[in-house]
């Protein structure tokens, strides 16, 4: 096995371990896993204020549990004044019991067997597609694990959104890789005729790379060493090799969708924007990624037929940010984004302009030609202040290429000299089959809802899935 960098030493395996709750995942820092402590350079008063706010939030959450559970279940009968385990009657496709808990004014249905104590639940964040909390549960293999519960936001609002939910629930069941998150549970408390809420449970994989990079910027001290950076890049490529071999494009690679443990084990998260490339499809959308990590062909040309090489561009943006600590192309809107890209990577040459015209139109070519022309800069000069290795610069130059047909592939990248110390071909798996998502046909939002219901009904739990009390393993 290749060695793995950590905050204080180099452990011996890069295969992800399923850890007990006593050793929760955390970023590679020397901060305690079990106590909230201020960083060395953190302002004490600010930290104390944040701790008081967190305690107040926990107190409010505790007060809301009983009230919201009663409202959601209609059960006003209490065993005693201290009783807080108010469970619904068996409901949903598998007739499970739930406790309804209010977190940040959002009601979460948490299945029986999961920890619902106020101090055990943590709100991790939310976005346009859902909200995520962290708790723990005893799993089928007997271990108690930290898990992340994602409640999808308005999953069946329209056909486009409903198809996205279907893809994510489908892919999280298909993915089986050390560096890729997978579904440990998929459930709903609703009945089929009133199916509205979808929950997906995954392992809690640690803090996001975005949070770690932000910590570096906020506290003014570097957390990730050169060895960390190299190992992170290797693991992303290792995961992309598997994803791309299944003819899947992730489409949303960014620091916020990557998580790290204390041992620097990496997991790719959130497959809500991923999709299959198995069949020719002209419905690939332009505005899928966070703009800063979008490839030029996603921003302007080939917007209907870009390939998984767009993921490789995103990897280049992430690699550069790992080196410098700052986003590489922080554009405010598409035109500004494109200008930032060409200022570093150069404007399209005649060969690429011809491809753009052939694949799109002369009008698109004319627009691109109207921008200020830039020559590609010397990456060694641009990044010299950060003392990167020659191999790092060489890989970065091959990732950040305007013409996707000349961009390095994942199969080539994993063999690059920069990653030689971690490369282990026999432990860099490909998918054993092409993933057919059955999502290319147009459907109504109700038809997509029916498809998601079937995914929940047919979900096969893993050995690491939370145990359902009193129910035989399925």
Curated annotation (Swiss-Prot):
Disruption phenotype: Weak defect in the extension of body wall muscle connections or arms towards the ventral nerve cord. Double knockout with madd-3 suppresses the muscle arm extension defects, eva-1 and rab-7 expression defects and restores the defect in the recruitment of madd-4 to the muscle membrane in the madd-3 single knockout. Triple knockout with madd-3 and unc-54 results in paralysis (as in the unc-54 single knockout), and suppresses the lethality phenotype in the double madd-3 and unc-54 mutant. Activated by phosphorylation on threonine and tyrosine. Residues 52-69 have a biased composition (Basic and acidic residues). A motif (TXY) lies at residues 285-287. GO terms for biological process: axon regeneration; behavioral response to nicotine; intracellular signal transduction; MAPK cascade; p38MAPK cascade; positive regulation of axon extension involved in regeneration; regulation of 3'-UTR-mediated mRNA stabilization; regulation of axon extension involved in axon guidance. PROSITE patterns: MAPK, PROTEIN_KINASE_ATP, PROTEIN_KINASE_DOM. The modification Phosphotyrosine is found at residue 287. Dually phosphorylated on Thr-285 and Tyr-287, which activates the enzyme. It comes from the Eukaryota. Residues 30-48 have a biased composition (Polar residues). The modification Phosphothreonine is found at residue 285. One of its GO terms (cellular component) is axon. Residues 114-419 form the Protein kinase domain. Expressed throughout the intestine. The keyword Methyltransferase does not apply. The active site is at 252 (proton acceptor). Its cofactor is Mg(2+). It is found in: Nucleus; Cytoplasm; Cell projection, Axon; Cell projection, Dendrite. Its EC number is 2.7.11.24. The keyword Protein biosynthesis does not apply. Responds to activation by environmental stress and pro-inflammatory cytokines by phosphorylating downstream targets. Involved in axon regeneration after injury, probably downstream of dlk-1 and mkk-4 and upstream of mak-2. May phosphorylate mak-2. Plays a role in cilium length regulation, possibly by reducing rab-5 mediated endocytosis. Plays a role in the formation of muscle connections, also called muscle arm extensions, between the body wall and the motor axons in the dorsal and ventral cord. Interacts with mak-2. May interact with vhp-1. May interact with uev-3. Belongs to the protein kinase superfamily. CMGC Ser/Thr protein kinase family. MAP kinase subfamily. This is Mitogen-activated protein kinase pmk-3. It comes from Caenorhabditis elegans. The gene is pmk-3.
